[in-house]
């Protein structure tokens, strides 16, 4: 299937996919366009491990991009499948996994289509920095809930929608500090935690805990915090029955 065909998927934004495809070759440059993703990645792993061990678990990484999180999960002992609709980015993910000899099963497919044929298959589903880039985040959340096993864990991360998140995640991060490429985010697509939780509960997921990601511009360091006002992560569990 061509990228043009993938762009027509009901829950794909062609401009978002094209933007990420254009940046595909910079995905693994830790000082480049996606440097911030590399820096927060250890925090994402740390957050997941608070609730579920990774070793020997079946894991689905939704919107895996170039594979930053997928590879880390695999190196921690997970049996990882990464899915995305950006073809060039997924090619980079596959090539990098070969270079690093890290086993990740990558597939060019939507979350919704994958969940149809892999229902209740995964111990863990992750969907990081992805919901704010799709037209219908609720559809992704429902697909994640469908793919995870009863009693399994689903982890989301996205951006809160408020004045502070606009100032820090768009104006400061994109325009001033160049932490992420200009045009990466659209403030209207940001999702408040209460909105995400309502969608997750409708999908049969139950909130266990949340955490924020805070950036210190002087030290250029990220840390987990209890404030969810800008970048945040939420941990959900599917009912065991």
Curated annotation (Swiss-Prot):
It catalyses: a 3-demethylubiquinol + S-adenosyl-L-methionine = a ubiquinol + S-adenosyl-L-homocysteine + H(+); a 3-(all-trans-polyprenyl)benzene-1,2-diol + S-adenosyl-L-methionine = a 2-methoxy-6-(all-trans-polyprenyl)phenol + S-adenosyl-L-homocysteine + H(+). Signal peptide: none annotated. GO terms for biological process: methylation. This is Ubiquinone biosynthesis O-methyltransferase. It is an enzyme of class 2 (transferase). CDD domains: AdoMet_MTases. Its EC number is 2.1.1.222, 2.1.1.64. GO terms for molecular function: 2-polyprenyl-6-hydroxyphenol methylase activity; 3-demethylubiquinol 3-O-methyltransferase activity; polyprenyldihydroxybenzoate methyltransferase activity. SUPFAM superfamilies: S-adenosyl-L-methionine-dependent methyltransferases (SSF53335). Pfam families: Methyltransf_23. It comes from the Bacteria. The gene is ubiG. S-adenosyl-L-methionine binds at residues 44, 63, 84, 128. Belongs to the methyltransferase superfamily. UbiG/COQ3 family. PANTHER family: METHYLTRANSFERASE (PTHR43464), UBIQUINONE BIOSYNTHESIS O-METHYLTRANSFERASE, MITOCHONDRIAL (PTHR43464:SF19). Pathway: Cofactor biosynthesis; ubiquinone biosynthesis. Keywords: Methyltransferase, S-adenosyl-L-methionine, Transferase, Ubiquinone biosynthesis.
